[in-house]
Amino acid sequence: MSLSKEVKSFQWTQALRRELQGFTSDVKAAVIKDATSLLNGLDFSEVSNVQRIMRKERRDDKDLQRLRSLNQTVHSLVDPKSTSKKNVLKVGRLSAEELMTLAADLEKLKAKIMRTERPQASGVYMGNLTAQQLDQRSQILQMVGMRRPQQGASGVVRVWDVKDSSLLNNQFGTMPSLTMACMAKQSQTPLNDVVQALTDLGLLYTVKYPNLSDLERLKDKHPVLGVITEQQSSINISGYNFSLGAAVKAGAALLHGGNMLESILIKPSNSEDLLKAVLGAKKKLNMFVSDQVGDRNPYENILYKVCLSGEGWPYIACRTSVVGRAWENTTIDLTNEKLVANSSRPVPGAAGPPQVGLSYSQTMLLKDLMGGIDPNAPTWIDIEGRFNDPVEIAIFQPQNGQFIHFYREPTDQKQFKQDSKYSHGMDLADLFNAQAGLTSSVIGALPQGMVLSCQGSDDIRKLLDSQNRRDIKLIDVEMTKEASREYEDKVWDKYGWLCKMHTGVVRDKKKKEITPHCALMDCIIFESASKARLPDLKTVHNILPHDLIFRGPNVVTL
């Protein structure tokens, strides 16, 4: 859905500046004072060492300890700080609708950031492997004739081999005072010259995003800007880098006026008003959380920074003492609000309280995702398990290649094991982390009066009726068993990678081994049989993200 949307980045920035001008302040004097303190108090030989560490492709616990130690020194030398504070938002200054929008956007932002922090290159997982494993993998790749994957435009993938990844949180943000101090000391330039150069960069930022061409022109007037790197900053490169983004932020902090977001101060007394203003700007310009991995857009950036800490300067302050992430430190409490009026007869497909197992933010995210379903496109549905205890549900639209596919932990484990032997071949242990509440939520969010095709309608009709979806119509194609499964092998050969849950041996009543039944594969098989050809799907994707289908530990992986 969001692929069709355009992030009008600078336009959004300007809108946020207008809406939040009442929360800005003059921070120039404080930033220069801190830069002076850092110039006098920091050991810049250690700064140079940390910069070297940050250029390494693989970094370990010792490297992290060194970074954290230097960050603590910086923290002790500066005044503007962000403090670690849990923020619970309830209905009051913010309406229930605004809170639910906020919760949904935080959930989307979490999904985006987690994907960004698990970088992949050419389909190769670059996760938390040890240095020895990475060396062994490089040797094996060379042995089998594979070259090392080329890195994309986002910069070098940095791998952290650390025991406790939570210690990485909040250790990498840039600070204007630190950027200024490093530029002055490491380029051997007076601090006043650095201030003048960055101020000009900040003035340019009031009308556009400065780029490398702008930087090149400004170097004639301000040679110190030559220390700014032309390479795009990679993920988590630390606050000691000389990126253009760090320099622009510093320039913005030095401007008195301009309503720069970098000078926002958030306090417990104004945090709700500030968030309300952010949501107001979002609504006016249709801002959104993009599903594309990479740098945050202006709305995502301010949302994360404000929700990370409920007190301090979210853009320019030292935040190394802040614990947790934005979605952990800001929570939405709607427990005392009746979001939906009590009704003895629920309206089919109407939005109601989230089902057991789904949070409010997950419910809002699901509602947004389900908006991508075309109510008029041919659609197949199939289930595995019993209508009153389904374990797998798939809804497939062959015209656009999108589908909804999820699982459910069974209530009747004895019946499940029987069905596994003779039908689906699924392992009970693989379903323990399946997200509860999806069945009711997904079926409830299907478009009103939708028409679904199926092969055998009895169980599906009962399932829909049990969810008060009698408005949904079923077309039973009523093929013979043999005809319906004519394309089974071809479908599994081409699309079997879409589902890896059917791992068991399945036998028919004559004890002959057969292919396990998968709800998604069956939808594609029935589509093929009805058209007498295998569908040629240009794209195929599940509209439900993995972390909505399965519960998982709240662990940050970088």
From Swiss-Prot:
GO terms for biological process: negative stranded viral RNA replication; RNA-templated viral transcription; symbiont-mediated suppression of host cytoplasmic pattern recognition receptor signaling pathway via inhibition of IKBKE activity. Zn(2+) binds at residues 392, 499, 502, 518. Transmembrane segments: none annotated. Its main location: virion. It comes from the Viruses. It is found in: Virion; Host cytoplasm. The record marks 459 as: Important for exonuclease activity. Residues 54-237 are annotated as: Binding site for the cap structure m7GTP. Keywords: Capsid protein, Helical capsid protein, Host cytoplasm, Host-virus interaction, Hydrolase, Inhibition of host IKBKE by virus, Inhibition of host innate immune response by virus, Inhibition of host RLR pathway by virus, Interferon antiviral system evasion, Manganese, Metal-binding, Ribonucleoprotein, RNA-binding, Viral immunoevasion, Viral nucleoprotein, Virion, Zinc. Mn(2+) binds at residues 382, 384, 522. Pfam families: Arena_ncap_C (PF17290), Arena_nucleocap (PF00843). One of its GO terms (cellular component) is helical viral capsid. Its EC number is 3.1.13.-. GO terms for molecular function: hydrolase activity; metal ion binding; RNA binding. The N-terminal region is important for the cap-binding activity while the C-terminal region contains the 3'-5' exoribonuclease activity. A CCHE zinc binding site is present in the C-terminal region and may thus contribute to the substrate binding and/or the specificity of the exonuclease activity. Encapsidates the genome, protecting it from nucleases. The encapsidated genomic RNA is termed the nucleocapsid (NC). Serves as template for viral transcription and replication. The increased presence of protein N in host cell does not seem to trigger the switch from transcription to replication as observed in other negative strain RNA viruses. Belongs to the arenaviridae nucleocapsid protein family. HAMAP family: ARENA_NCAP. Homomultimerizes to form the nucleocapsid. Binds to viral genomic RNA. Interacts with glycoprotein G2. Interacts with protein Z; this interaction probably directs the encapsidated genome to budding sites. Interacts with protein L; this interaction does not interfere with Z-L interaction. Interacts with host IKBKE (via Protein kinase domain); the interaction inhibits IKBKE kinase activity. This is Nucleoprotein.
